[in-house]
Amino acid sequence: MTSKKLTPMMKQWHQCKEQAGESLLLFRMGDFYEAFYEDAVLLSQHLDLTLTQRQGIPMSGIPVSTINGYIDRLVSKGFKVAVAEQLDEVQDGKGKSEPLSRELQRFITPGTLLSSSLLPEKAHNYIVSINRVGALFGFSCLDFSTGSFLLQEYDNKKDLIDEICRLAPTEILSCDKFYKKHSDVIEQLLQHLKLTLSTYSDWAFEHQFATQKLSAHFKVSSLDGFGLKGLVPAINAAGALLSYLQDKLLLPIEHISIPKTHGNQKYLLVDTASQVNLELLAPLHDPQGKSSLLHVMERTCTPMGGRLLRNTLVSPFYDQKEILLRQDAVEFLLNRSELRKNLRSFLSQVRDLERLTTRVTTSLASPKDVGMLRDSLHASIRVFEVLSPLPLPEFFQGKFIPTIGLASLLDLLSKALLGELPLRISEGNIFSDDYHPDLKRLRYTRENSKEWLWDYQETIRKQTGVKKLKVCYSQALGYYIEVSSDLAPLLPKEFIRRQSRLHAERFTTEKLQEFQDDMLHVSDKLQMLETELFKDLCSRILEQREAILSLSQVIADVDYILSLADLAAEHNYCRPVVDSSDSLAILGGIHPVAQTLLDRGTFIPNDIKMHSTRTRMILITGPNMAGKSTYIRQIALLVIMAQMGSFIPAKSAHIGMIDKIFTRIGAGDNLSKGMSTFMVEMAETANILHNATDRSLVILDEVGRGTSTYDGLAIAQSVVEYLLFTEGKKAKTLFATHYKELTDLEKHCPHVENFHAGVKENGGQPVFLYEILKGHSQRSFGIHVAKLAGFPLCVVSRAQQILRQLEGPEAASRQNQEKVQQLTLF
């Protein structure tokens, strides 16, 4: 259809669609949001809606009353949605030569959700913007639902990718130039994350524009006061992000907080591969399962506390003071079970203060949201009241600032609002009768009109002395007072004559006219009044915005500590000694996840003792299924928990702070990059060798197994030697291996110690002890594991026959020769 033949309404649609770009446009038409052309086809396909046609144009629609649920479904499928609203009211009984006005008013994308069911309650929903200037990558990260705004720079792609994967955004923004030049970065991110890619103009990433955008938003003349001096690529990314949100997506940005630089100097770095291998946030083979460390540790009562726990789990502290402050606070609550019970009771009543405040700031709050804010403030102040009189540890001191402003706000909200509040302002019944003088009168008029008329009739009868006076109603006159003609002269002058009849006179009064006016428009008046009162109340809330956000952080801290204390109490955890020493000593350590999955008392505790001047590397041999991998993962998890400030499942522990944790555990083909299992293994190992330090913890499981025996052994030993003898790379290393030849290293290097997964034989069958014992393993029992896996018995028998041949005298002689060759490598 040419533009000349387009109806006025379709011309509006085309204008909005041009502005919407790649987004799916929902166009308000009366009681429906309609989609046209390709958008209609997509809407029909993905939401199972009927596809129709009008004048050959495909169209599909969604009822206005159900729009939010359908938008959520579209966004969950990766769509960006644009919404064009109808600005005019339909005029009843009047034709219009011009179409109703419409304009594009909002966009919804995966990274800009505010009040969607898709928002994870206890996780951030980030949108990330990336830019590069010279050798530096800059990125800005925003949780639009809370206003949290972070900036950082990196000098290499690996650290950039690891940090973005740690944050797990749902949307990434950059310019075409970046996407084309650094497609490898995007490919790697897409392997780990479910992402929507968004593109914005190159000019928005220019430094002058970005600086001006940020300065204007935060109302400053310089960004140096925010600690951003010299962070050119990060500033470029941040300014472009704000412009994208405000200028392209038409979103409010008033709630976005002053940006913070998100450095890693105070945090234990756990790279992306290690987060996955250690199953910190989700199980490897069951993303919805319960075998992650997060699931085990999660005891938080509030969304803010849950997000803090999740963030700290993937970025534990590398700062002794921060760790000790939290340990002291955990111990304080651990020893007070009744206090913990009371805190849980109050914290469970606190809703998402950050996101509620954002919805108020962006004028998207519902009455129900404000009611939840009121109830959350009340419960939060009760938390303060419970804790404030106590001899608090340092972590809590200074957090419970005077809450006079918030107490006043709470008092206002409590007096203003009814108990149960609606989702929409249009539903009414938001404010208490006493909050505004007109509320009571209008509601009384609406709900008690008959009683009011009867009372008014009796009142004026008494005032006038005319007992036969009646208050009546007609379609033509509305409400009126009727008396017989002979009694009319008895009425006061303020009675206004309306109509004369043959034997009667009809009057009205100002009060009756006011009642009639109220009755005719009472619902509209009530809605208008409550709408204005609600806007005013939200503005009063915003006066305390910063105080509410500070309160939110305090509640998150209390909830985090309470969660760790409850965890320690439930499982009888110990307080580890965490300091700057080179020690890693754990007595009776237990895998925190396995402990919860197995019956109490069935998990076998194990020890570890390492020190940079003594044992720096432990080689662990033994059969599969005997517990090697569980043990080495366990050590890493206990270190992470300890540096979160948590107590840990052990009898005792002394942990010198670790700066980085690396793992090389298992692998799979990466077909998208043309990488075999062995290539993935080698790439991950190379990353460890390049980035490990003397204070790192390295977990290696079967390095070198993906190639021939000689190649694999040579690679494994060279990796061991590199980590043992290279200055600056002498990390504490746990190396699980089937290469028995490596165990001879213990004889030649005092920093290497052999351990094995214990096995006893009973009637020729192995019994796994799940203990890690001193010395190396004598047998692998691989054929027995094959039998347990269901190999045909004939295959098992043949394997045993071949094994006996290989273990004969000639094989033994050959193995001795190989050992001599192996030692020369060392």
From Swiss-Prot:
Similarity comment: Belongs to the DNA mismatch repair MutS family.
Any matching Pfam family: MutS_I
Binding site for ATP: 622-629
Full protein name: DNA mismatch repair protein MutS
CC per GO annotation: cytosol
Biological process terms in GO annotation: mismatch repair
HAMAP family recorded: MutS (MF_00096)
Domain of life: Bacteria
Keywords of the record: ATP-binding, DNA damage, DNA repair, DNA-binding, Nucleotide-binding
Annotated GO MF terms: ATP binding; ATP-dependent DNA damage sensor activity; damaged DNA binding; mismatched DNA binding
Keyword DNA repair: yes
Secreted as UniProt keyword: no
Primary role: This protein is involved in the repair of mismatches in DNA. It is possible that it carries out the mismatch recognition step. This protein has a weak ATPase activity.
InterPro entries attached to this UniProt entry: DNA_mismatch_repair_MutS, DNA_mismatch_repair_MutS-lik_N, DNA_mismatch_repair_MutS/MSH, DNA_mismatch_repair_MutS_C, DNA_mismatch_repair_MutS_clamp, DNA_mismatch_repair_MutS_core, DNA_mismatch_repair_MutS_N, DNA_mismatch_repair_MutS_sf
PANTHER family in alphabetical order: DNA MISMATCH REPAIR PROTEIN MSH1, MITOCHONDRIAL (PTHR11361:SF34), DNA MISMATCH REPAIR PROTEIN MUTS FAMILY MEMBER (PTHR11361)
